[in-house]
Amino acid sequence: DTHLFAEKHETLLGVNTWESYQAVLDAIHAEKRPCDLIVATGDLAQDQSSAAYQHFAEGIASFSVPCVWLPGNHDFQPAMYSSLQEAGISPAKCVFTGDQWQILLLDSQVFGVPHGELSDYQLDWLETKLAAEPNRNTLLLLHHHPLPAGCSWLDQHSLRNSAALDSVLAKFPRVKNLLCGHIHQEQDLDWNGRRLLATPSTCV
C-alpha cells in the first residue's frame, strides 16, 4: 500500500507518499537482510496513473530481485499491468519457491468500490492450483482482509465473500499462511488453523 502519485510532491492525508516510500526502502537497505522476492499486495498508486507505477518500479529496482504484484481497490489494472511489465516486473500469479512452497496471488478487486470480492473464476483458479500441487505448502496473497480488523470503517471494506474462500481452503490443509494489505496496520491472527498476516502501509 504505497499510494504513490504521478507527481512526487503529492500527499495523502498530509503524508508525502513518495518520501515515505523512499524512507521505507532506505530502512530495508540499512538492515541488510537477504531478500529473494518482493510481493506487492496492492494500492501501489493512489491516482491510477502510469507514472505512479513507474515510481514504484524505480524504487524497488535497487533490490535486484523479482517482484510479483496484485491489485488493490485504488489500482487501475490496465496502467498497472503495462507500466510494471515495461519495468520488467512479472504479472505472474503463481510462484514456486524451492521444492516445498508455492505463492499464489488472488485478485480481490471490485473496480470502483473499496470492498473486495473473489470472483467465481478466482476461486476456481485457486482450487485448481491447489489441487495440482497437493504436496506443496502455500502462501496465499490478496489485497482485502478476510477477517475483521477491529475498525468498523475498515471492516465495511473487507473481503465480502471470505466464507467462500474459507470453503475452498478447508479442502487444502497445506495452505499455511495468508498475507493481505488494505488495512494499513499489523495483524497476526489464526483463521481456522491458518496464519493470517497484514502489514502496515509505507505511508499512512
Kindly give the residue locations of the regions a language model identified.
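Alpha-helical scaffolding within the catalytic cores
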Residues: 23-24, 54, 79-94, 124-127, ...
